[in-house]
């Protein structure tokens, strides 16, 4: 990106201020996600709230000057984030440069980038049962009872490994949105995102079979990605999602990240309902992101007997449980491919689809209203071994 001479000159005015800042103050701004899975030399820089676009352009000129003095091997500024309430960027650079950047009065804090992973487990043979569970008060049903609106008018952004949009399950309702995996094609190379999309809005497997789907690729063929890449995906949704009509579904996670949580929270404030996986470590979900993001709908997994899956994270940040063991849905490889897998990744799209379904029914104009509706109609007290979590199973309010 090119900058005018006037911006570069303006940036130079800030350099003495940056150089003069105490070293302790610089280091105090630099945080680590609660993780061992740090991405070396990659950082997420978060601006103070209220910083305007002119200030940001000036800051990028200042950063360019800082980087010009350092090793050229680093890539420099990558993803840029511009969600109302959350502005910043990702940068690859050395520790010396990041210390200078931290000294800027425009920077609120900086977080070391961390890895995220798809929250899916082993592949098994099995049969579809999740749709029956979320449309009946009792276990064991093989039928899905739902209103014919089926999520019509709603859009679900699947922030994941992409979607095989040509799959017959999607009937032309899935499209490509954005790709934040460098050098990868605009398709799902893993299968995880396609499986989640099928549970959300597939013709056969979907909770909201008339909802629209948008693929936002942040995970590679191995199901891996970065916090900075996920935030880039969230930024895309925040800029394109329609207030009150959009759902963001994320069946992924990693260790706690304040930056990732902040991006989620800002997107919710902008009118997008966000549904996230609790995680698969059988641990307290408050230590994971985006599971711990405030006001996101965090989903744990149960099996066909309403028992919390042993892998499912738990705790006070959970909002609801949904089917997550032996869930059958669409897959990659052919237009009719399917697969049966387990994980909180599989529970999450049931609830994302439910959110889209409820939006399609009408009368819900905000993420808070959607979350409240899911909580009010859910099946209370049926989860075995909730382990300190809310005892609530997702339900669409239709079947007996």
Swiss-Prot record:
Stored Pfam families: Inhibitor_I9, Peptidase_S8
Residues modified by glycosylation: 82
Propeptide section residues: 21-119
GO annotation, biological process: proteolysis
Gene3D superfamilies: Peptidase S8 propeptide/proteinase inhibitor I9, Peptidase S8/S53 domain
A cellular-component GO term for this protein: extracellular region
Activity profile over pH: Optimum pH is 9-10.
Residues at the catalytic site: 160, 192, 345
Domain Peptidase S8: 128-400
GO molecular function: serine-type endopeptidase activity
Top-level EC class: hydrolase
Residues with site note (Cleavage): 119-120
Boundaries of every Inhibitor I9 domain copy: 42-117
UniProt keyword terms in alphabetical order: Glycoprotein, Hydrolase, Protease, Secreted, Serine protease, Signal
Subcellular location: Secreted
CDD domains to which the protein is assigned, alphabetical: Peptidases_S8_PCSK9_ProteinaseK_like (cd04077)
EC number annotated for this UniProt entry: 3.4.21.-
Secreted among keywords: yes
Temperature dependence: Optimum temperature is 20-30 degrees Celsius.
Signal peptide location: 1-20
Similarity comment text for this entry: Belongs to the peptidase S8 family.
Function noted in UniProt: Major secreted subtilisin-like serine endopeptidase. Preferentially cleaves substrates containing hydrophobic residues at P4, positively charged residues at P3, small or flexible residues at P2, and large, bulky residues at P1. Mediates the degradation of collagen, the major structural protein in the mammalian host. Degrades the nonhelical regions of collagen that function in the cross-linking of the helical components. May function as virulence factor involved in epidermal wing necrosis observed in white nose syndrome (WNS) in bats.
Protein name: Subtilisin-like protease 2
UniProt organism field: Pseudogymnoascus destructans (strain ATCC MYA-4855 / 20631-21)
